[in-house]
Regions:
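Intrinsic disorder/low-complexity signature
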Residues: 1-3, 350
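Hydrophobic h-region of N-terminal signal peptides that target proteins for export
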Residues: 11-20
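Active-site neighborhoods and metal-handling regions in enzymes and metal-associated proteins
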Residues: 20-484
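Sec-dependent signal peptide recognition
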Residues: 3-11
Length: 484
């Protein structure tokens, strides 16, 4: 059987296996019980995602999906805890018959109740139901309708925000508390069912990286490589990308969140591919940086080896109970020593006068010269969101069993890197010393990102796509030989 036939067979089989890996109803009930266990007495009000604007793909909000598994728009969940007992009700809307011709007919109440294990009522009675509970003096726990990391939505009055504001206006004495921190603490520990789905997303992302490694060549457009990668996701039965795919070559490799993907790749470029499949609502996030021509240049190789060494250092620290701070510090230390050795900074502990000086008061790392070359976090949680709990890039927490997360060090040498610096004596001295080296390494951006889960015995590496220089160059060489 040819490799193409094997891949086709896998693609045909995967969607069925994905369905078998959904979260069981009992697990959703256990999640709701865990949430109400954090509440002495009160009413938890959660809002799902509304209808999308225009003809866009609809997705459920992660916290709402986590608690219900319900995948219809405009729903709300009310959990009531009093007297040591809890109950839950899902409020849904009946779709307009004409609208149903466009969007499909939603399940009836009996079907929803059977699938979710929740009592089901009509959304128009939500206000009266919560009013009666608030009038009884129960505090309200608000699970607002925005994604956890969606700061823009938090600053606007969403449907849920408007509901809570109106509730407070009607009941001035009601106590309202934020339920998101509680749900975030529950979401960070992934169950075996969640990990099965997440592994599927990661495996398909690894397959996409392997296809890209074989398919990239000089003269190819970034968007063609993006299409190759995302095609693997869809052929494998997943929803598509879990975020906007980043495919940045040459100078674009130095832009952390480059998304235009419209440059023609040239011989001698590296290309950063920061991509992830979304399968069953769970997001993978894996980055590889590869040479378009098949072999790294001397400068690219030096930067790549340094980034890989930094990633290995953080992998060694990531264990149950290990502090996030020690994890971050291990990588920063390796990068700082390596950058100093290459001459890109004056010394491993050298500082500069940054435009963000106020940040240095809370964390001195922001003022180190090494920070210029990696100003993003070292990693993040993955799950129902691509930036899921936990959030180890900040704070003083520790790793716990069940944490699924990324490690993504990088070094980026932009042609504009030194242009952002203020004209101060310290900065002038640094620029005078490092500018020739910056020019030598300019337009080289390297990021290596992998997905992991903390286990009782340590850490498991999930995303086993080629990442060592020898593996990458060997795979590219094999492709070149087969193409002859």
């Amino acid at each position: 059987m040819t490799p193409y036939c094997i891949r086709t067979l896998i693609a045909l089989l995967l969607p069925a296996s994905l369905v078998a890996q959904q979260i069981p109803r009992a697990e959703y009930a256990a999640r709701r019980d865990s949430l109400t266990a954090h509440v002495d007495s009160g009413v938890i009000v959660a809002f799902g995602a509304p209808d999308p604007v225009g003809i866009r793909r609809w997705t459920q909000l992660p916290a709402f999906r986590y608690l219900t598994g319900f995948l219809e728009p405009n729903a709300a969940l009310v959990l009531v805890k009093r007297g040591g007992r809890s109950s839950g009700t899902l409020f849904t809307v009946a779709r307009d018959p004409r609208r149903a011709l466009y969007d499909g007919f939603p399940p009836d109440s009996a079907t929803v109740a059977g699938e979710t294990g929740l009592a089901v009522r009509s959304l128009p009675v939500l206000r009266a139901a919560v009013d009666s509970l608030a009038a009884g003096g129960l505090p309200i726990y608000d699970l607002r309708d925005f994604a956890t990391a969606d700061a823009a939505s938090q600053d606007t009055l969403t449907r849920g925000g408007s509901f809570i504001a109106d509730l407070v206006a009607r009941h001035p004495g009601v106590v309202v508390r934020n339920a998101h921190p509680i749900v975030d603490s529950l979401r960070r520990r992934k169950s075996s069912a969640e990990l099965a789905i997440l592994r599927r997303a990661v495996d398909l992302t690894v397959q996409a990286h392997k296809e890209a490694l074989r398919g990239v060549k000089p003269g190819m457009w970034e968007y063609q490589l993006e299409a190759l990668i995302e095609g693997v996701f869809r052929r494998g039965g997943c929803e598509g990308p879990s975020f906007a795919s980043i495919v940045g070559s040459g100078p674009n490799s130095t832009q952390y969140h480059y998304q235009m993907n419209n440059r023609r790749m040239a011989a001698g470029d590296v290309v950063v591919m920061d991509v992830g499949a979304s399968c069953g609502g769970y997001a993978a996030d894996v980055t590889r940086t590869i040479p378009v021509s098949g072999r790294f240049t001397r400068e690219q190789r030096a930067i790549y080896q340094l980034v890989r060494q930094a990633q290995a250092a953080s992998e060694r620290v990531a264990r149950p109970g290990a502090s996030w701070q020690a994890w971050r510090d291990s990588t920063r230390a390796v990068e700082a020593r390596g950058l100093a050795r290459l001459g890109l900074i004056q010394s491993a502990d050298a500082t500069f006068d940054p435009p963000w000086a106020e940040r240095c008061r809370t964390d001195p790392v922001y003022c180190t010269q090494a920070f210029l070359y990696m100003a993003h976090g070292l990693g993040h949680g993955i799950g129902l969101e691509v930036h899921d709990p936990p959030h180890p890039w900040v704070g003083t927490g520790t790793f716990q069993v069940g944490d699924a997360f990324t490690i993504e060090p990088g070094i980026y040498v932009s042609t504009r890197l030194l242009d952002i610096l203020a004209d101060t004596p310290k900065n002038r001295a640094m620029i005078a010393q490092v500018r020739p080296v910056v020019e030598q390494y300019q337009n080289i951006g390297i990021r290596i990102e992998d997905d992991y889960v903390i286990t009782p015995n340590g850490v498991e590496w999930l995303s086993r796509a080629p990442r060592e220089i020898g593996e990458i160059e060997a795979a590219r060489l094999t492709r070149a030989v087969m193409a002859r």
